[in-house]
């Protein structure tokens, strides 16, 4: 994991020089099947070139800070924007106390300008593990509202619902700084 952190730091430095962005994310999740609550935090480092968005996401999840089992994940993400809608793909690695496996995901959605610095986002994601037996096949729908604080700073809130192998409702708070 230390190598991934060093790699991410190097990537962040390179992206910052290329005119990229960094996002900090906080998730509050509720598992509808078990009633368990969970928190997750993530950092995303990325770069936009025209209609393309390339990013690396690292996340850490736990039932509460300092208590409970920890899971970690890393994803390489590519997204293409077409006028108002977008399509994306992800390749990732998930590490839990009992498993370590690779996965993929496909995203699609619509970004809607709402005016006065606000933007809406409605979309969906399909995700699954490459190898069978990991119980990771999940579809997620989301709705989000973002606000541009400045030309370089934005905040967003997203509500999502997942179903399949994960039955979760989640709220995500996000801060993004563009360079």
Across the structure, where does each feature detected by a protein language model lie?
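Residue-level signature of outer-membrane beta-barrel architecture
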Residues: 45-49, 78-82, 93, 110-112, ...
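Residues that define the transmembrane beta-barrel architecture of outer-membrane proteins
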Residues: 37-41, 68-74, 95, 100-106, ...
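Cleavable N-terminal export/targeting peptides
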Residues: 1-23
């Amino acid at each position: 994991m230390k190598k991934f952190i060093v790699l991410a730091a190097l990537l962040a430095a390179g992206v910052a020089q290329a005119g990229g962005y960094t996002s900090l994310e906080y998730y509050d999740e509720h598992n509808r099947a078990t009633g368990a609550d969970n928190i997750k935090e993530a950092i995303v480092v990325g770069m936009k070139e025209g209609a393309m968005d390339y990013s690396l996401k690292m996340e850490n999840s736990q039932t509460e800070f300092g208590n409970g089992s920890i899971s970690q994940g890393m994803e390489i993400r590519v997204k293409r924007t077409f006028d108002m809608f977008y399509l994306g793909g992800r390749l990732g690695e998930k590490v839990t106390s009992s498993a370590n496996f690779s996965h993929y995901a496909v995203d699609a959605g619509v970004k809607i300008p709402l005016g006065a610095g606000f933007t809406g986002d409605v979309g969906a994601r399909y995700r699954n593990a490459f190898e069978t037996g990991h119980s990771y096949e999940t579809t997620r729908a989301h709705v989000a509202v973002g606000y541009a604080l400045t030309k370089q700073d934005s905040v967003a809130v997203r509500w999502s619902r997942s179903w399949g192998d994960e039955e979760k409702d989640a709220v995500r708070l996000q801060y993004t700084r563009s360079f």
